[in-house]
Swiss-Prot record:
It comes from Sus scrofa (Pig). Keywords: ATP-binding, Chaperone, Cytoplasm, Hydrolase, Magnesium, Metal-binding, Nucleotide-binding. ADP binds at G15, G67, T68, T69, S70. The gene is CCT3. Component of the chaperonin-containing T-complex (TRiC), a hexadecamer composed of two identical back-to-back stacked rings enclosing a protein folding chamber. Each ring is made up of eight different subunits: TCP1/CCT1, CCT2, CCT3, CCT4, CCT5, CCT6A/CCT6, CCT7, CCT8. Interacts with PACRG. Interacts with DNAAF4. Interacts with DLEC1. This is T-complex protein 1 subunit gamma.
Amino acid sequence: NAAKTIADIIRTCLGPKSMMKMLLDPMGGIVMTNDGNAILREIQVQHPAAKSMIEISRTQDEEVGDGTTSVIILAGEMLSVA
């Protein structure tokens, strides 16, 4: 359920009509972004499945450099039908 929540948060950041998200950074400042990778870097999660989703995104970014939002949405959909 936590991994699906991560996918639902990131889902609206994909495509030409993506929506901006407002985040609080560790210093208390407001960050507005529609970059899925930036959002996943800023959020803190405790659930192991959600941590795995974020690790998938980081690996995608390191190996390919793009597609972090897509890989999270794809993994979330795979978990929802499992």
